[in-house]
Amino acid sequence: MTRYFLAVHTRPTPGRETEYHRWYDDFHLDEVLQVPDFVTAERHVLVQSEGAQLLGPGSHLAVFTITSDDIDATMTAFRHAQKSMARPACLDADSVALSWWRPLGSRTASSSPLVPDSA
């Protein structure tokens, strides 16, 4: 099985932030996790700091982990499931942007040759 990620940028409709968070946490994450091969869901919010730039159309990011031997079939299943997923008014529809990712490599500080050994 190969691991993939679906990144979804969104933002709440102004003035409906509480409703947006409730919908996402109490309903939508579980709705997406019902799609075959989707195994984890994690939400993030943009950290506002000096010089921070918005890299996507939304201030919020959901990252879904997928494990699949056939990502094309998984993507098709997701698109089919999307047709019945709720799009509540608390979600700014213009902010929704999806992108699919496949890891190219990974490293931890403990395995990096540039990080000094603490021993």
Regions found by a protein language model. Name each.
Residues 1-119:
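Macromolecular interaction modules
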